[in-house]
Each structure stands twice: as C-alpha cells, then as structure tokens.
C-alpha cells in the first residue's frame, strides 16, 4: 500500500466515515455512522468512544452519515462541525451550543487545529426523526488544512461538478476522499473525471461496497483514471485499515 508521508493517519471505517489523526495528535471523524454501519469493524465502534474525538465533521443529514451523531456527541465530548441547519437540529436535541460550529459553503472555521472550508456538493440532505422528514440544509464537502499544511478534500456525497476544478485551483489538495459507488453518488468514471479536475496526488475511494447497489470498485476507478490520463495514486483501503 502507498504511504502519504504527511504525519497524518487516515482510517476508513466503511461507507463514508473516516477517522483521522492529525499531525498535532488530534482525532477527528468525518461523518458519524458507526454502530449501524454493516462494514465498520467492531474494534472501531469501541475505539471512537474509548479513545475520544476532538471533532466530528458532518457532510450532510442522511442517516448513513449522521445516525450515531447524538450518541457520539455524548460519548466523546467532541466539537461538532456542520452546516448551520444540522447544528441547529443538534442544539434542539440537547447538544450544547459551545460544542457546535455551524457555518455554510464558502466559509472557513478553525477547529482542533484544523482550518476547514465548506465546499459545494450536489446531492440531498434530510433526516427522518421519529417518522418526520427533517430538512438538514444542503449537502457539502470540506477542504481540511492540517497543522503542518497538508491539505485534504472530502467531496461529500456528490456527482462530479466543475466546482471541483475551482477547489483544485484554489486549495491544491494533495489527497481527495470521494465516492465511487454509483446510484446515489458518482460512479468510477465520474470520480475519475473529478480527479482530473482536482489534480491531487492521492485519492481514497469511499461510499461503495456497503450494499449491493453500490457497485463501483477501486479497480474501476483506476481503469477510468488511466483512460482520462489522470496521474493519481488510488489508495484502496478495506474497512478498518489505515494509511499514513
């Protein structure tokens, strides 16, 4: 497996959830689907609680990205970062305002030593709360700048958009997390074109293989990158695996 070499450890917990240990030793989670996640290893279900979290970044409101957020908010005392609509809902559920950082696309905040800029994605964002469909604002991604200057971009659940070229031009991310599963998000061909626009050194595919309907594979992504002439190292993690 390739190494990143940026004093950052990235662990895939399956589907769209990632655990990141930053160069400064902070522990962050991107999206919060752990307990009900059928591919998240039991070890990680325990570790995110026992080791604690400094911050949780939420991309949107679908159950497979926030189902465990209230439990993890209680268990870890993490600062929760997301679109203002999501953090307002969390406040209504009893999460303290001092632990919520709500903002919107184009905005930048600093949490746990990380400078995070919220970016555009194209998807949808609702949550079913006690049988009621609750709007959760709009879907988003994040550009994350680590303490040592390492830049990562998590696209969120999305189709390919030309905005990705702007993100590549402005922030020059070295590593991109992006979905490849098809049906609800990009397929491998669209994801490869997204990488052509962004031009990172590394790509970590996600949001595939959780259910049979999410058919895209990392090998298909590599094939499409080759077809588009994209020079990128695709890091193919299995749920529970890490790369540094």
From Swiss-Prot:
Pfam families on file: Lactamase_B_2
Parts of the chain that traverse the membrane: none
Family matches, as Gene3D superfamilies: Ribonuclease Z/Hydroxyacylglutathione hydrolase-like
Keywords for the protein's UniProt record, in alphabetical order: Hydrolase
GO MF entries: hydrolase activity
Protein family membership: Belongs to the UPF0173 family.
HAMAP family: UPF0173 (MF_00457)
Protein name (Swiss-Prot/TrEMBL): UPF0173 metal-dependent hydrolase Rcas_3617
């Amino acid at each position: 497996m390739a190494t990143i070499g940026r004093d950052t450890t990235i662990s895939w917990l399956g589907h769209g959830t990632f655990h990141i240990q930053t160069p400064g030793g902070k522990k962050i989670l991107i999206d919060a689907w752990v307990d009900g996640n059928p591919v998240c290893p039991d070890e990680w279900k325990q570790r995110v609680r026992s080791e604690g979290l400094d911050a949780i970044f939420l991309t949107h409101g679908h159950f497979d990205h926030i189902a465990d957020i209230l439990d993890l908010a209680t268990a870890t005392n993490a600062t929760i970062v997301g679109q203002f609509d999501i953090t307002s809902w969390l406040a209504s559920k009893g999460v303290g305002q001092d632990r919520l950082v709500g903002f919107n696309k184009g905005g930048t905040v600093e949490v746990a030593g990380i400078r995070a800029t919220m970016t555009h994605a194209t998807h949808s964002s609702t949550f079913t709360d006690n049988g009621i469909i609750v709007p959760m604002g709009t879907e988003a991604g994040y550009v994350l700048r680590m303490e040592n200057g390492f830049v990562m971009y998590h696209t969120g659940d999305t189709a390919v958009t030309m905005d990705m070229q702007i993100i590549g031009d402005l922030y020059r991310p070295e590593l991109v997390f992006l979905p490849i599963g098809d049906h609800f998000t990009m397929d491998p061909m669209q994801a490869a074109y997204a990488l052509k626009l962004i031009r990172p050194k590394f790509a970590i595919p996600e949001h595939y293989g959780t259910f049979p309907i999410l058919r895209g594979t990392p090998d298909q992504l590599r094939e499409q990158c080759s077809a588009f002439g994209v020079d990128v190292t695709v890091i193919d993690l299995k749920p529970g695996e890490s790369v540094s």
